């Protein structure tokens, strides 16, 4: 049994995942009624979501209480990259929406949902998440609260006994080992997730909303393969695409199927470790990115809002479009703190153009219909960009120090 397990682990993870992906598609088409297969996906995502909050909490405390040097410069660079890329994504989304305008088929039937009334509501939600009880934050996977309390406790523990610090290191190493075990289960998890998607949705989602999906996905791909590499080149002064494709394989692929930035945090952290990045830095920037680095969310909010405006015959001028870009970027940063994520921030953006709330909620309903594709690509972009930009910022520091940068 041990030999079989060792043989399994010796195979490249990406090859195992591709195998699971192919098997999931085949089973979804041949035996769509075999619902038990989907359980593998549920267990995989559940395990990642369960370990991620604890991993982030312990890693950040352990890193900060041991840290004798400042990592503020790298972290500051990462935050700037996160914010700039999100604003840039919303601006690009405005241009693509203008170049390829899309209208929507609205219906009367939709389910009323609660959405934020203003940008103030979004930031109020973020502020309340920061000061939420740390135990509650862990159980609810509130990463803003987890990060805030972990930073405070980590700084306070800098004067703790060495035995206490060593214990925290041992716990963080143990949790990292558990993450490795879970990641080795990824091929089965991906198989279950793909099976569930194919057996329940088939290809029908492409037929009715194909043009809208092409606009959303095309814009997201443009950000990942064109604008993000420019940011990487600015940091490293090297060909960015080896790093771009590494992050695509190691992070975007799993994020696409889990559809959860939180579940992908352990995977991104493991890849940062494999790249030789500083744990004191990435233990903060990766979970922070899962909260505020929301290129995909900014694109979704912008494209869906402009599609609603086109449908109602509302002309959006350049100043209004710029204002929408800023609003979408700021809103996207709070998407993780809103139930329903980016889709439920659409009504707030629609209000900028006087679009009635009932129409805006129908647009949200369309968003949920295409979510099987839109949300998957959005999460893949968001999560892989966390890894890409975190690595780029640290490589920028390496370049300044004269260290060799290898992808």
Where in this protein do the model-derived segments appear?
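Hydrophobic transmembrane alpha-helical segments of multi-pass transport and channel proteins
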Residues: 47, 83-87, 91, 217-221, ...
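Helix-loop-helix junctions within the multi-pass membrane cores of secondary transporters/permeases
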Residues: 250-332, 389, 400-407
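Membrane-water interface of transmembrane alpha-helices in multipass transporters/channels
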Residues: 36, 40, 72, 203-211, ...
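Active-site-adjacent helical/loop segments in soluble small-molecule enzymes
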Residues: 44, 50-59
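Juxtamembrane helix-boundary/capping and inter-helix hinge elements in multi-pass membrane proteins
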Residues: 64-73, 159-163, 200-201, 237-240, ...
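Transmembrane alpha-helical segments and their short flanking loops
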Residues: 303-407
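Signature of multi-pass transmembrane helix bundles
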Residues: 8-30, 42-48, 73-242, 406-407
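Transmembrane alpha-helix boundary and packing residues in multipass membrane permease domains
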Residues: 25, 55-62, 94, 151-155, ...
């Amino acid at each position: 049994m041990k030999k079989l397990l060792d043989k399994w682990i010796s195979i490249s993870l990406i090859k195992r995942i591709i195998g699971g992906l192919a098997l999931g598609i085949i089973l979804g088409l041949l035996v769509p009624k075999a619902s038990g297969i989907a359980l593998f996906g549920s267990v995989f995502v559940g395990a990642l979501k369960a370990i991620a909050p604890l991993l982030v909490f312990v890693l950040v405390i352990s890193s900060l209480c041991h840290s004798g040097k400042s990592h503020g410069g790298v972290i500051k660079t990462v935050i700037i990259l996160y914010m700039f890329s999100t604003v840039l994504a919303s601006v690009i989304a405005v241009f693509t929406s203008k170049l390829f305008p899309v209208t929507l088929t609205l219906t009367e039937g939709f389910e009323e949902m609660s959405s934020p009334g203003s940008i103030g509501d979004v930031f109020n939600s973020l502020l309340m998440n920061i000061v939420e009880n740390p135990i509650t934050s862990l159980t609810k996977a509130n990463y803003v609260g987890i990060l805030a309390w972990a930073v405070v406790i980590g700084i306070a523990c800098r004067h703790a006994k060495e035995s206490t610090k060593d214990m925290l290191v041992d716990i963080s190493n143990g949790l990292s080992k558990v993450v490795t075990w879970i990641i080795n289960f990824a091929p089965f998890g991906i198989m279950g997730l793909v099976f569930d998607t194919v057996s329940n949705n088939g290809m029908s989602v492409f037929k009715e909303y194909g043009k809208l999906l092409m606009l959303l996905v095309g814009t997201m791909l443009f950000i990942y393969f064109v604008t993000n590499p420019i940011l990487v080149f600015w940091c490293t002064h090297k060909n960015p695409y080896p790093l771009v494709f590494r992050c695509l394989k190691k992070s975007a692929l799993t994020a696409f199927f889990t559809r959860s930035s939180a579940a992908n945090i352990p995977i991104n952290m493991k890849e940062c470790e494999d790249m030789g990045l500083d744990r004191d830095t990435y233990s903060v920037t990766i979970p922070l990115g899962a909260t505020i680095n929301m290129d995909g969310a900014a694109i979704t909010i912008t494209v869906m809002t402009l599609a609603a405006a086109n449908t109602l015959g509302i002309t959006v001028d350049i100043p209004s479009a710029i204002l929408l870009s800023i609003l979408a970027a700021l809103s996207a940063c709070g998407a993780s703190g809103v139930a329903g994520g980016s889709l439920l921030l659409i009504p707030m953006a629609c209000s900028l153009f006087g679009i009635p709330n009932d129409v805006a909620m129908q647009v949200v309903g369309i968003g949920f219909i295409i979510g099987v594709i839109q949300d998957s690509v959005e999460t893949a972009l968001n999560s892989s960009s966390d890894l890409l930009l975190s690595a780029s910022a640290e490589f920028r520091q390496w370049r300044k120090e004269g260290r060799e940068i290898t992808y």
